Amino acid sequence: MYIKSLELKNYRNYESLCINISPGTNILYGDNAQGKTNILEALYLAGTTKSHRGSKDREIIQFDREEAHIRMMVERNGSTHKIDMHLKKNKSKGIAIDGVPIRKASELFGIVNIAVSYTHLRAHETTLHL
C-alpha cells in the first residue's frame, strides 16, 4: 500500500494544498511552524478517522471556516482508492471510500495501514509509518 496523493482544504494552516507522493521514502522539511506535522496529522486522520494529536475536529478547521476537507488517494494491490473526509464544526465527520459513505473506522483498515511514531533522534523529527 502507498499513498499517492493528499489534498487539503481549510485544514489548519492550509487553505488549499495538493501533494503528489511517490512510492518509497518521502521527506517533509521546512522551518518550524510551517505545517509539516499538520500534513502527517491529515494522513493519519484520513487513514484512521482520529488525530494522533488528540485534536477535536473543530480545532482542525481553519479559523472563520465552517468545514475542512481531506482527500487521500491510496494504491493497494494494484487498485487505487479515494478516501474523502469532510469535517464540519458542529456535525460528525463524513467519510467515504470511493464515493461510498462509511459508518465505522474499521472499514478503512483493509485499505489503509498507517501509524505514527515519535522517535526523536532530534527534537523536531517525526516518523510516519505507512
Locations of the language-model features?
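Cytosolic catalytic cores of cyclic-nucleotide second-messenger enzymes
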Residues: 130
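Nucleotide-state sensing region of NTPase/ATPase domains
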Residues: 47-118
